[in-house]
Regions:
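Conserved catalytic-core motifs of GNAT/GCN5-like acyltransferases
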Residues: 140-142, 160-174
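Conserved acyl-donor/pantetheine-binding loop and adjacent beta-alpha core of acyl/acetyltransferases
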Residues: 69-107, 113
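Conserved acetyl-CoA-binding loop-helix of GNAT-fold acetyltransferases
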Residues: 107-130
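Conserved GNAT acetyl-CoA-binding A-motif
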Residues: 103-105, 129-144
Length: 210
């Protein structure tokens, strides 16, 4: 098995939508929901992410098996996420983090059976993001579905839960999400402890083969 991790191209957006639509999530009542992220993402949205933000894809024999997206500060500040930050239930003083050096982990989606690849792609994404950003925020949905895909990596990278937010969307109703923060200086310490730093420094981002 030959796995490549590379920058996403505009033409990859079609495969990304297909992966999103194959994802399944466990509802808190024990049932399973299929069809991708709760609120969905359009082909055009993925193309915009690819053009403007940090977006990596993983391939197995040239077939895309997963992807990750981090929004740069410019995109974040123009998003609904940024507008809604004052509606969140914070466990920290959020004003200390409202700076140009904040980015946001938007999506992580993989087909089943590629756990190790997920972690490696996430490390690559954070390496890119922390070249120009000091703090990374992300949210994970806790109700009405459980989206736990990113939590193992968040914990490995030194992330911590720092709040929650309740949102109401006409198409789905009430959504509850936990908010996490990964700070660059803590991430660097965790990376050094993991022993992966030399590997990430040595291999170009354009192509990761393992």
């Amino acid at each position: 098995m030959k796995i490549n991790i590379r920058y996403a191209k505009l033409e990859d957006a079609v495969a990304m939508v297909a992966i999103k639509n194959r994802l399944s999530f466990k509802n808190i009542n024990g049932t399973t929901t299929t069809g991708g992220f709760l609120l969905g993402t359009t082909l055009q949205t993925y193309q915009e992410y690819i053009a403007n933000d940090y977006c990596l894809v993983a391939e197995n024999e040239y077939q895309i098996i997963g992807f990750g997206i981090i929004l740069k500060n410019t995109t974040l500040q123009q998003s609904d996420i940024w507008t809604k930050r004052h509606a969140a239930n914070w466990e920290i003083d959020i004003t200390k983090y409202e700076s140009p050096n904040v980015c946001y982990f938007e999506q992580l989606a993989f087909l089943r059976g590629y756990t190790r690849v997920v972690i490696r792609l996430c490390y690559q994404l954070l390496q890119l993001a922390f070249n120009t950003h000091d703090n990374l925020f992300t949210t994970t949905v806790s109700s009405p579905i459980l989206n736990l895909a990113a939590i193992p990596f968040i914990e490995k990278a030194g992330g911590r839960k720092i709040g929650s937010i309740n949102e109401v969307y006409p198409e789905v109703g009430l959504i509850l999400s936990d908010i996490y923060l990964i700070e660059k200086h803590i991430y660097i310490k965790r990376l050094e402890q993991s022993g992966l730093q030399p590997l990430l420094n040595r291999i170009p981002y354009e192509l990761q083969i393992f």
